[in-house]
Regions:
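Transmembrane beta-strands of outer-membrane beta-barrel pores
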Residues: 15-21, 52, 68-74, 113, ...
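Outer-membrane beta-barrel "beta-signal"
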Residues: 12, 16, 147-148, 179-196
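Extracellular loop and loop/strand-boundary signature of outer-membrane beta-barrel proteins
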Residues: 31-38, 91-97, 129-132, 171-177
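Surface-exposed strand-loop-strand hairpins of Gram-negative outer-membrane beta-barrel proteins
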Residues: 18-47, 168
Length: 196
């Protein structure tokens, strides 16, 4: 029987937390106003997509997930040095807080090992195109664990780490000078429609 004759597929939805990782760099001297620092926090991290599973009944099987993410990232932009001294008190610039809508479109391919009847582990890669706030490509590495609750429901927990310096492309608008990687931890539910 060919691989393509042994395909299971269905809807996948997920929600989780994101970890934008701000890269460090050498700070310029005190008083250089080009030196802004950033703190990032995901307020919303969700996705929806479709999964194709090849060789679903075998000990080793493969998943191909096509997903679209919906993320809201809150960024705090602040100046790490004191600006002045007033009445013996050091005064810093007021921090700016702004929100950005981040939309990644991803095609994730993973190799999976079923080590019990219900549980499996997987590793893979996820080429990702961010279409918001700016168009930029990233390549994530992925690790995941899954639990098959029933014939028509599976839970999964996955972690993805973006290999490229994606944040440097999000510097239009109120941000400038930031750089770093994007990663997230996602809990998902897979609902197969077609079982082979």
């Amino acid at each position: 029987t060919s691989t393509f004759a042994q395909i299971e597929h269905g809807l996948i939805v997920g929600a989780g937390v994101g970890f934008p990782l701000q890269a460090r760099w050498n700070r310029p001297p005190w008083g250089d106003e080009s030196n802004w620092s950033y703190r990032h926090d995901y307020k919303l991290n969700s996705m929806i997509g479709y999964r194709f599973r090849f060789l679903p009944e075998q000990k080793f099987f493969y998943d191909l997930d096509i997903t679209m993410g919906f993320q809201k990232m809150e960024t705090t932009k602040y100046f790490p040095y004191y600006e002045s001294i007033e009445d013996g008190i050091y005064v810093s610039k007021k921090a700016d807080v702004f929100d950005e809508f981040v939309m990644p479109i991803s095609v994730a391919a993973s190799w999976n090992w079923r080590f019990t009847k219900k549980f499996h582990l997987g590793v893979g890669i996820a080429p990702t195109l961010y279409v918001q706030p700016q168009a930029v490509f990233d390549l994530s590495v992925m690790a995941k664990v899954g639990y098959r609750l029933s014939k028509h429901c599976e839970f999964g927990l996955s972690y993805q780490y973006g290999c490229f310096n994606t944040l440097k492309h999000f510097n239009n608008g109120p941000a400038n000078g930031r750089r770093g990687h994007l990663s997230d931890l996602m809990l998902s539910v897979y609902v197969p429609f077609v079982l082979k």
